[in-house]
Amino acid sequence: MGPNGKPRKYLGVRYDLTQHEIARQNMKGLVEAIDKSYSTIEFDLTGTIQNANGLFLKTMGYSLEELKGKHHSMLIASSCYGTTEYRSFWEKLGRGEYDAGQYQRMAKGGREVWLQASYNPVLDDMGRPFKVILLAMDITGQKQAQVEVEKLIKAATAGQLSERIETESFHGASRELTESVNRLLDAVASPLHEAQTVLAALAKKDLTRSMS
């Protein structure tokens, strides 16, 4: 400042924000991509629900208001709550260790949902976990298709070759799987049925019957 109280010169400090802005935009894009592709839900270290995205809410049939502030245990079968395994699960996350796999969860109304998911502890600047984020994909259709295929194989092994999977309720890859299994069984069963017919005819001495 000059003697008259007016400024004589200005000091300017310029910060290069280019790299910071690039990093911010990259992170923003990553978060948006995850939000569009995965069901996500956030918990504190006690398992209390903090937030959830639209895909998770749609998958589980809840609104955010119905979930926020509630405990993770509302999303699991009642038989699992209070078990040693369930306590160990949250203790593990509290230590900052992630957990991944296929999880059976209960949606609104008791509907069974299967998730391919990972529970990821988030660390603060000191390396201490302070929350857990679940990233998940709904694989309920695949699991149901797997169950139906296993039932069909068991029936075929027992000689029930007329059994087929009702494919109308499946979509996408699950629909393709169940339809292909049905076609495979058709291909196997048809000549077997024909052979059974011929053998039955032979047993009756009807030698005019033959396999085409």
Positions of the model-derived regions?
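PAS/PAC sensory module
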Residues: M1, L11, D99-Q104, G109-A117, ...
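PAS-family sensory domains
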Residues: K6-D16, R128-D138
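Polar/charged heptad-repeat coiled-coil helices used as signal-transmission/dimerization stalks
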Residues: Q19-K36, K58, E65, R87-E91, ...
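PAS and PAS-like sensory modules
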Residues: S39, E85, D99-Q104, M211
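Conserved hydrophobic beta-strand signature of PAS-family and PAS-like sensory domains
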Residues: T40, G47-Q50, S174
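PAS/LOV sensory domain surfaces, especially short acidic/polar patches at coil-to-helix junctions
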Residues: T46, Q50-K58, K70
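PAS-family sensory/regulatory domains
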Residues: E66-C80
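Output-coupling edge of small sensory domains
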Residues: N120-V122
